[in-house]
Amino acid sequence: MADITDKTAEQLENLNIQDDQKQAATGSESQSVENSSASLYVGDLEPSVSEAHLYDIFSPIGSVSSIRVCRDAITKTSLGYAYVNFNDHEAGRKAIEQLNYTPIKGRLCRIMWSQRDPSLRKKGSGNIFIKNLHPDIDNKALYDTFSVFGDILSSKIATDENGKSKGFGFVHFEEEGAAKEAIDALNGMLLNGQEIYVAPHLSRKERDSQLEETKAHYTNLYVKNINSETTDEQFQELFAKFGPIVSASLEKDADGKLKGFGFVNYEKHEDAVKAVEALNDSELNGEKLYVGRAQKKNERMHVLKKQYEAYRLEKMAKYQGVNLFVKNLDDSVDDEKLEEEFAPYGTITSAKVMRTENGKSKGFGFVCFSTPEEATKAITEKNQQIVAGKPLYVAIAQRKDVRRSQLAQQIQARNQMRYQQATAAAAAAAAGMPGQFMPPMFYGVMPPRGVPFNGPNPQQMNPMGGMPKNGMPPQFRNGPVYGVPPQGGFPRNANDNNQFYQQKQRQALGEQLYKKVSAKTSNEEAAGKITGMILDLPPQEVFPLLESDELFEQHYKEASAAYESFKKEQEQQTEQA
């Protein structure tokens, strides 16, 4: 990408590039060429793309009135999309034609008309669904294929967390007639050697209604648990007694052997119902048959998911408040020892120490009581109690998704605190407060260069920000080291003294943790966030992590998963905007 010239920078000063805290200019000018301005949504942007880069790209198309790259309110990092507003609709149309899916800093951008009215974005008319897409079909190929039928408001291939196509996508036309033409022309067409399915997009409510209609009038049956000795004649004869049959077939493999299931299609729904009622759980050649309504794969998956969710909720309710998580266990503690330690506090339904494939203790386990009261009593009595030379950590067990959600909230809270501290520090510096300025503490990350750990005398600041000359954090092999007091002097009273040593302890722990975390990831931002999350634990829980690689690995994985979950939520917010 060409560098921004002085002339471009000068032009940018005359633009109404809005403040990050304000909303982008509104408008849904795609609905009519009579509108005097046009607002475009520009998505899939590389994080470093700025308003200046976008101006350099879009200004040759026409007169740009404003540009805004949307950013996180706390971290100020790009959310991956922007709004570009032109002074006339024709310039916006040309920008879509000429720049849509062109690379910006190595990424293909996605441009569409900005739809500020939610009712226009969510309307069903003109929106179509495409499935069975070849993995090589990307957003540009999808757009190019369907744009010949009319103006497209948006198009998108659904992708997984790794950016790979899920095999389906959506195209939203401005006009409903264009959508109908596309369906008529492309449904069943071969695209990259695969026959695609194109149909109007249905909302979940409409799909559920359609499914209920199918259930109420089904004629096709699925039969399983069929004995391998069963013949086609036996199978058809068994079902023919309930009414006229359109077809009956037993599924076979390439060698002609039965797969153990088949299908029967009746002429009338009533006959199919009779067959299900009479033959389900009946025996044929010594095997108990299953006979039920035939379902499509996606419907079966939906049913299985609902069953699993019901089971999961039932299990959650059953163990709510009674299942305890116990960590920092000595390697000598086994299931029996764990149960013995907690037995005095109530009836234990299970006690388990988690182990590796080789049978080695992972240093944590679970104890399940019969009532919440017993579990609460055990937490009160056993948490921080020494067992086999180690202080136990005992708490109510939480699901992974709950822990990840909590850790993600901690990330957001920490980002907000850091932003507020930096803002307050800048304000204090601007006010010229002599001798009292303390640099903001950046917990969970290495301090920025030029900012020392301890309170400064500005003329004595270490330019390496509290780091030794070799640039590596100091090593502490035997726990935290309480160093020299800050340059502002010793603590004046007992309370200040306690706070001072707590700060030094946290600093020492953070330095050691950061070293272990940074050895696991090359992403500096992730290393800082993960270190901060682990450092939020009480010090007595952090110390064991420095000694036990297995305990550290467990906490690192949880914090890393929470960080990734947080990043995905940001990306989803970007897509929904």
From Swiss-Prot:
Record's keyword terms, sorted: Acetylation, Cytoplasm, Isopeptide bond, Methylation, mRNA processing, mRNA transport, Nucleus, Phosphoprotein, Repeat, RNA-binding, Translation regulation, Transport, Ubl conjugation
- Region (Interaction with SUP35) location: 473-577
> Would I find Acetylation among this entry's keywords?
yes
Q: Which InterPro entries does this chain map to? A: Nucleotide-bd_a/b_plait_sf (IPR012677), PABP-dom (IPR036053), PABP_1234 (IPR006515), PABP_HYD_C (IPR002004), PABP_RRM1 (IPR034364), RBD_domain_sf (IPR035979), RRM2_I_PABPs (IPR045305), RRM_dom (IPR000504)
Record's Gene Ontology CC terms? cytoplasm; cytoplasmic stress granule; cytosol; intracellular membraneless organelle; nucleus; ribonucleoprotein complex; ribosome
Q: Where is the PABC domain?
A: 489-568
Q: Does the keyword Kinase apply?
A: no
Record domain RRM: where: 38-116, 126-203, 219-296, 322-399
Q: In the UniProt annotation, what is the result of changing K362Q?
A: In PAB1-14; fails to bind poly(U), but not poly(A) RNA
Q: Which residues carry this modification: Phosphoserine?
A: S249, S332, S405
User: Could you tell me where the Polar residues compositional bias lies?
Assistant: 11-27
SMART domains xrefs: PolyA, RRM, RRM_1
Please give the PROSITE patterns that the UniProt record associates with this protein.
PABC, RRM
Q: Name one GO molecular function term.
A: molecular condensate scaffold activity
Q: Where in the cell does this protein reside? A: Cytoplasm; Nucleus
Q: Which residues carry this modification: N-acetylalanine?
A: A2
> Positions of the region Disordered?
1-36
Gene Ontology biological-process annotations: mRNA 3'-end processing; mRNA transport; regulation of nuclear-transcribed mRNA poly(A) tail shortening; regulation of translational initiation
Recorded hits in PANTHER family, A to Z, give:
RNA BINDING PROTEIN
> What remark about domains does the record contain?
RNA recognition motifs (RRMs) 1 and 2 bind specifically to the poly(A) tail, whereas RRMs 3 and 4 bind non-specifically to polypyrimidine RNAs and may serve to bind to a different part of the messenger or to other RNAs. RRM 2 also mediates interaction with eIF-4G.
Quote the record's miscellaneous comment: Present with 198000 molecules/cell in log phase SD medium.
Q: How does it assemble?
A: Binds to poly(A) mRNA to form a periodic structure with a packing density of one molecule per 25 adenylate residues. Interacts with the nuclear export factor CRM1 and with the importin SXM1. Interacts with RNA15, a component of the cleavage factor IA (CFIA) complex. Interacts with translation initiation factor eIF4G (TIF4631 or TIF4632) and release factor eRF3 (SUP35). Interacts with the PAB-dependent poly(A)-nuclease (PAN) complex regulatory subunit PAN3. Interacts with ARF1, DCP1, PBP1, the Hsp70 chaperone SSA1, and TPA1. Interacts with PAT1 in an RNA-dependent manner.
Q: This protein is called what?
A: Polyadenylate-binding protein, cytoplasmic and nuclear
Naturally occurring in which organism (per UniProt) = Saccharomyces cerevisiae (strain ATCC 204508 / S288c) (Baker's yeast)
